[in-house]
Regions:
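An N-terminal, well-structured beta->alpha segment
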Residues: 1-73, 152-185
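Short beta-strand-to-turn element immediately C-terminal to the catalytic PLP-Schiff-base lysine
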Residues: 117-120, 257-261, 338-340
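Proline/glycine-rich low-complexity loops and linkers
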Residues: 71, 131-165, 169, 260-333, ...
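Phosphate-binding and adjacent anionic-ligand microenvironments
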Residues: 245, 283-463
């Protein structure tokens, strides 16, 4: 069974039996549940729902079912075609729609797909709203329209350009400095929608580029998660020389990673750190990232006189906390940049434009820019448990044990995070399988891994 239901939507592998995978019957059920929620929540007077998708092989099939179901529920559909996640988010806001559905499984392999659900602001649903949709779907408590009240279908392919124009209009995007820098970059678009929109953005910025895996056919050339072990091709290309940097995105272009001019990874955790440093140097203020993200953002924020706040993991949790503390920038350590001057969503186009602006103004190499930030390393481990294990009870014991130590700050808004003076470890339970994910950070990878292993042993001893 691969069908995973969450507050942000549903995802699963294509094919199989109803209830077990992402198949036509479940796509209809959850689309109808979402449409029912939108209608009865009365958050918008619009009768239009935006639909956009990445270039996955299954995307055309899923899109047809989603659009037909929405029309059957009486909603007008605005299909913006092949589009990034942030483009679709912006399209909801620009068109004053009632909501939006993004068809993408983000960094998951090619045989996966998903429905991601947006509110009228083009932002992901809150936990309470998401649970309402799941409850409606579970009860199949929806009613389709009669023949006289079916929705209409419209296509609009202009939102890619409108997205680019909105990025170029941001005050901190220094188009002149970027153009004068004469950057030459390599781009890995992982055979998805980045191959459509990133060339247009780079041309508008006056950047010379070489596309790798640029054909948006959904047949991903490698594992689509933008991590070093998956990026041998572009790292090798840049290592040959002649490039100022490499740009890597995931299939729906909400995650962003950079590669230094020498072919080495800039570090996905440092995408947000570097962009935040640039933004804070021009507009001092507060920042937010999730509990599993690098401490380097806190250090950079405090250096600029701001206050850093951690949120629970998940984009909607980050954006909610950003609004609470009036953060000028935030995001997630997986390469997700959220810049409220644009919109409250992870956006690789915004990240690219701000990063290039910073690099152009500083006049340095990417590796030199990376060296200006605090050096931390994150280790990732997991604890496999039995289905009968009371994970919450274990996490409570960890909290109690370390809460007695004066030099440890304990945070329990999302699992348990233990902040030591010079390192941290975060334990989170999975919502879909009996495991605890263990993230740890320190000044060396060896120390980070040792800390994670130590907490793993603590958990084993508690069983």
């Amino acid at each position: 069974m691969t069908l995973i239901k969450s507050i942000s939507g549903i995802r699963g592998t294509i094919g199989g039996q109803a209830g077990d995978t992402l198949n036509p019957l479940d796509i209809v059920k959850f689309t109808a549940a979402y449409a029912t929620f939108i209608r009865y929540s009365k958050q918008s007077e619009s009768n239009t729902i935006v639909v956009g998708r990445d270039a996955r092989i299954s995307g055309e099939m899923v899109k047809n079912i989603v659009c037909g179901t929405l029309m059957g529920m009486g909603y007008d559909v605005l299909n913006i075609g092949l589009a990034t996640t942030p483009t679709t988010e912006l399209a909801v806001r620009m068109s004053k729609a009632a909501g939006g559905i993004i068809i993408t499984a983000s960094h998951n392999p090619r045989h996966w797909n998903a429905l991601k659900l947006l509110n009228q602001e083009g932002e992901f649903l809150t936990k309470d709203n998401g649970n309402e949709v799941l409850e409606i779907a579970e009860k199949e408590n929806f009613e389709f329209s009669d023949v006289d009240h079916l929705g209409k279908y419209t296509e609009d392919s202009t939102f890619n350009q409108r997205h680019i124009e909105s990025v170029l209009a941001l005050k901190l995007v220094d188009r002149e400095a970027i153009r004068n820098a004469h950057f030459k970059v390599a781009v890995d678009a992982i055979n998805s929608v980045g191959g459509i929109i990133l060339p247009e953005l780079l041309k508008a910025l006056g950047v010379e580029y070489t596309m790798i895996n640029g054909e948006p056919n959904g047949d991903f050339a490698h594992n689509p998660e933008p991590l070093a072990q998956n990026l041998g091709g572009i790292m090798s290309e840049i290592g040959k020389g002649g490039y100022d940097l490499g740009i890597v995105v995931d299939p729906d272009v909400d995650r962003l990673a950079f590669i230094c001019e020498d072919g080495k990874m800039f570090g996905e955790e440092y995408t947000l750190v570097s962009v935040a440093d640039y933004v804070l140097s021009h507009t001092p203020g507060n920042t937010v990232s999730n509990l599993s993200s690098t401490r380097a953002l806190r250090d950079v924020t405090e250096r600029h006189g701001g206050v850093y706040t951690a949120s629970a993991v998940g984009e909607v949790n980050v954006t909610t906390k950003m609004k609470e503390v009036n953060a000028v920038i935030g995001g997630e350590g997986n390469g997700g940049v959220i810049y409220p001057e644009s919109h409250y969503g992870r956006d690789a186009l915004v990240g690219i434009a701000l990063f290039l602006s910073s690099l152009a103004q500083k006049g340095c190499k990417v590796s030199e820019l990376r060296a200006t930030f605090p050096e931390y390393f994150i280790a990732k481990n997991r604890i496999d448990l039995t289905a009968s294990t009371d994970v919450d009870a274990i996490l409570e014991k960890v909290k109690e044990q370390y809460g007695k130590q004066a030099d440890v700050k304990v945070t329990d808004i999302d699992g348990v995070k233990l902040d030591f003076p010079d390192k941290w470890v975060h334990l989170r339970k999975s919502n879909t399988e009996p495991i605890i994910r263990v993230y740890s950070e320190a000044s060396t990878m060896e120390e980070a891994d040792a800390l994670g292993k130590k907490l793993m042993q603590v958990v084993y001893d508690m069983q």
